[in-house]
Structure formats: structure tokens, C-alpha cells
Amino acid sequence: MGAYKYLEELWRKKQSDLMSFILRLRTWEYRQLPVIHKASRSSRPDKARKLGYKNKDGYAIWRVRVRRGGRKRPVSKGIVYGKPSSVGINQLKFARNLRSCAEERVGKRVPELRVLNSYWVGQDGTYKFYEVILADPSHNAIRNDPRINWICESAHKHRELRGLTSAGRKGRGLRVKGHRAKSLRTSRKGNWRARQMLKLRRYR
């Protein structure tokens, strides 16, 4: 087995004494750092390589932490229109997953880069930590590489904001195939709109 295979087997057993100790140390370290920061290297090189990262110019890894739990509805100045102040505010579940939120925040922080993918690196009682793989579309190493230069096209600007990354597609339900999958494409809202629309076709 190669070195990455051994790393992969270590990460499979996250509750082992070794991994729980390493994760406890790393989450402590990540809490001391800024919420979004550039990582000098990947914490999980095997996972990063699987998701498309190459250790060469043009690629970057940013680390981000996201608060765990649900999402409160943002209410301007506490205006709730006669209802109790917390009704319809708390206990709401966000439609997207936290990994998708992490990608979005990193994408807004470094808009000149393109989000390729992301992966989990740790969590504690309050936060989840993710590392996001980004590619620089203006770098020659990316533009001249036929395996990655598709991301340089303008259609892939801010793909993380449009649910086009792996985490975004999962949140949209696009990993489902077969029975009951037809109501998910092209999107839930678009499919619903098409089903509500009365179409009176004229045949000539």
C-alpha cells in the first residue's frame, strides 16, 4: 500500500485513540486562528488529492470554521408583526448543509479564485472545520492543464453560490437517481413551477 492508503485507513477510524487525540489538538489550534484563513498545506492530503487538489502552483487551500446548529431567521429590528418575538425565528433548519455554507464564505472572501471542492477536517461542540480547494483561473499552470482548465471558463464563476459544487449538488438532492428523482430536476422550485403552470397547447 502507498502512503496515502495508510492515511486513508487512519482517517476511517476517527474514534481511535490516535485520531481522537490528533483531532482534539487540531480543533484547538483551528479555534485560535481566524475564521477564514489560508492553510500552508492540506490537513488531509489523501482526501485533497482525491477531490482534485495538486501540490503545484495555481492551487490553494483555505480553512474555514462554521458554527454548528440551525439558522435563525434574520429579523430587521425585531419586527415580528404582533407575534411573540421568537415565533418563526428559532428552530429553523437551513436548506443547505454546512459544507456548502463554508464554500460560499470562502468564495466571497477570495472572489478571484474558483472553488473546486471541500472536505471536513474536524469539529467540536460549537464549530465544524472545513478545508476548501481553490484554483486560480488566471494562472498559467491551471490554464495549460487539460484536466482542470475547464474551471477557467466564465460559466464557472462562483459555482459555489449556485449549488454547482459537490456539496451544493448534494443539498439540491441531485445525488438521487431513479424513483422520485424526477421532481428534483432541474431544481425543486423550477420543477414545482412547471407542474403548477397550465399549458394549453395549440395544435396546427
From Swiss-Prot:
Superkingdom of origin: Eukaryota
GO cellular component, one term: cytosolic large ribosomal subunit
This protein's name: Large ribosomal subunit protein eL15
Keyword Acyltransferase: no
Transmembrane segments: none
Pfam families: Ribosomal_L15e (PF00827)
Gene3D superfamilies, per the entry: Ribosomal protein l15e (3.40.1120.10)
Origin species: Tetrahymena thermophila (strain SB210)
Record family assignment: Belongs to the eukaryotic ribosomal protein eL15 family.
A biological process from GO: cytoplasmic translation
UniProtKB keywords: Ribonucleoprotein, Ribosomal protein
Molecular function (Gene Ontology), one example: RNA binding
